[in-house]
Amino acid sequence: MTMENYSMAAQFVLDGLTQQAELQLPLFLLFLGIYVVTVVGNLGMILLIAVSPLLHTPMYYFLSSLSFVDFCYSSVITPKMLVNFLGKKNTILYSECMVQLFFFVVFVVAEGYLLTAMAYDRYVAICSPLLYNAIMSSWVCSLLVLAAFFLGFLSALTHTSAMMKLSFCKSHIINHYFCDVLPLLNLSCSNTHLNELLLFIIAGFNTLVPTLAVAVSYAFILYSILHIRSSEGRSKAFGTCSSHLMAVVIFFGSITFMYFKPPSSNSLDQEKVSSVFYTTVIPMLNPLIYSLRNKDVKKALRKVLVGK
């Protein structure tokens, strides 16, 4: 059978998070709750920023874009996972699997670069406050967001194109709850050396470059904060950055655990646990992290709800 015909006819079976029948309903309810909070939190954040003039600043423009990405890549993964918790045959078509892989990579890579853009925004705000409006113009902000999505699209196109050249003839059971790169490579009966090299290069670049950029930004930020004379000013600066830094550590920590090792050295069960963090937990936490400790967001929300 040719690869073209095989690809059109193939179905995969998603192994899911666990095979224990007694855990399927509790896990369904847990992840349904997480997904509802994710959707409400991120769409609510986008709407709040859109209708509140107080939040029409570069920082919240990036936060709105981040909320959009969190909503999208959670929605690429979670609905199918919820269906599989209740289904007997957890099948996914080859074409659906490739589409899921493509959009997952687009949004997860874009998330990393948006977090980097937000770090740069904080760097300019704290280290060059007088030039902030000139540097972080609407054109620059839009360009940074577009660059994040372009790099996500380029990474997804490369991974998906390389994956579609592989044959899957050993087994159709994917030991994961969604179509990710590593489980698919482990399933293929083709030579995957090129795919593994691409994974190492692309994942390494998309993790190392943003991490270094964030680290450099925060090194300058810390230096500037330590030279602020008033304790109130230092406290305000730390408060502005702490939420973002927390999101960065959680996101890049889980990504690094997943992709900074060769596929052969990864335990797929460990990968499932790590994947849960950046596919379901992080999209839920981000709007909470950025809103609970943010006076501007709480003030805007109060104004929308009570009109004061």
UniProtKB/Swiss-Prot annotation:
Checking SMART domains in the record gives: 7TM_GPCR_Srsx
Q: Which residues are glycosylated?
A: N5, N186
Q: Name one GO molecular function term.
A: G protein-coupled receptor activity
Tissue specificity statement from the Swiss-Prot or TrEMBL entry:
Expressed in the tongue.
An annotated GO cellular component of this protein is: plasma membrane
Q: Which GO terms describe its biological process?
A: G protein-coupled receptor signaling pathway; sensory perception of smell
Side of membrane Cytoplasmic, spans: 47-54, 121-139, 218-237, 293-308
State one Pfam family annotation.
7tm_4
> Topology with regard to the membrane?
Multi-pass membrane protein
User: Could you confirm whether the keyword Acetylation appears in this record?
Assistant: no
Q: Which InterPro entries match?
A: GPCR_Rhodpsn, GPCR_Rhodpsn_7TM, Olfact_rcpt
> What sections of the protein cross the membrane?
26-46, 55-75, 100-120, 140-160, 198-217, 238-258, 272-292
Covalent S-S links between cysteines: C97-C189
Main localization (coarse): membrane
From which domain of life does this come? Eukaryota
Give residue spans on the Extracellular membrane side. 1-25, 76-99, 161-197, 259-271
Record's keyword annotation contains Transmembrane: yes
Provide this UniProt record's keywords sorted from A to Z. Answer: Cell membrane, Disulfide bond, G-protein coupled receptor, Glycoprotein, Membrane, Olfaction, Receptor, Sensory transduction, Transducer, Transmembrane, Transmembrane helix
Question: What subcellular locations does the record give?
Answer: Cell membrane
Which family does the record assign? Belongs to the G-protein coupled receptor 1 family.
Its function, per the record, reads: Odorant receptor (Potential). May be involved in taste perception.
PANTHER family per record: OLFACTORY RECEPTOR
Name by which UniProt lists this protein: Olfactory receptor 8D1
Gene expressing this chain = OR8D1
